[in-house]
Every structure is written in structure tokens, then in C-alpha cells.
Amino acid sequence: MPFQIPDDLNRDLMPLAWMIGHWEGEGHGNTPDDGEFSFGCQVDFTDNGGDYLHYICQTFTMNPDGTPAAPLRMETGFWRPNVDTRKVDVLMAAPEGWAEVWTGNIDGAKIELVTDAVARTEEALVPYTGGQRLYGQVEGDLLWTFDRATVDAPLQPYMWARLKRS
């Protein structure tokens, strides 16, 4: 699906313009406790005229016919790029009981992020401590990876997906 940069897009969002829209696809993951798994994924990057993008990512288990079966995880947040330095700050929160501050670099259609801070509740579902992410555009698709560390496990691949703009 072709993408056009909106005429009224805030100048500061130009480095992230390729991300704007609705993306869907499938991904895979791996945890030390549960092993390998597959999931469906929907990601939305939206613009309201400000100097940030709103982000929401929903993953879910899938029925045999490929339709969503049950929620797996969800996160939402804000992406705030600096057009002059090609850096980006990302704030995210998840209902599993944590909030994150990510920092990173924008290199064309590739964005690398690392956690600057992770705050979690006493009842957080996973003792998550930090991570790395990579977002990129390949052949028009959005590819992302999420490596995660916990109190019990060092940084390791956790989730990855390839999504198509829809």
C-alpha cells in the first residue's frame, strides 16, 4: 500500500513519517519459562498535529483461521523525535505493570532504541528490567524486534514481527 506524507504533518515528525498508519501481521516470541510462541499483531502510529506520534501495539493469540483469539499483551505511548539531532525519545506503558523511557537514534527508516528507565509495580506480571528494540522498514513492511532482560534472565530476544500497512 503506498504511503503519502500528510501535507500538514508537523515538521518535527518528518523522520518518523514512514511509520504513520495502521500495521498488521504475525510475529514470534520466546521466553525462558514458556518457550517459543506465535502471535498476531496490530500497531498504530497516529498524528494529531503535535510534535509526537501516539503509538499503540496489541498482540494476541490466533485462531486456526488467523483471526484474533485472545489478548496477549498491549502497550501504548508517545514517540517524540528531534529532527535536528536524529534522536528519539519514546514513553511506553503496559497493563502488565510497567512503564518505560526509551532513547534512540533515527537512521533513515531504521530506529534503534534502548531503555533509559523501567518502572514496575509490585504486582508486575514479569520482573522486567530493560530492553532493546529495533524498528525498520523493509520492502514496505514494518519490522520490529524487542530484546528483554528480567531480574531472572539477561537481555535476550523476546518478540519480533513483520507487519504490513493496511
UniProtKB/Swiss-Prot annotation:
CDD domains: lipocalin_heme-bd-THAP4-like (cd07828). It comes from Cutibacterium acnes (strain DSM 16379 / KPA171202) (Propionibacterium acnes). A motif (GXWXGXG) lies at residues 21-27. It comes from the Bacteria. Pfam families: THAP4_heme-bd. The lineage of its organism: Bacteria, Bacillati, Actinomycetota, Actinomycetes, Propionibacteriales. InterPro entries: Calycin, Nb(III)_bact/plant, Nitrobindin, THAP4-like_heme-bd. PANTHER family: PEROXYNITRITE ISOMERASE THAP4, THAP4 PROTEIN. HAMAP family: nitrobindin. Belongs to the nitrobindin family. This is Ferric nitrobindin-like protein.
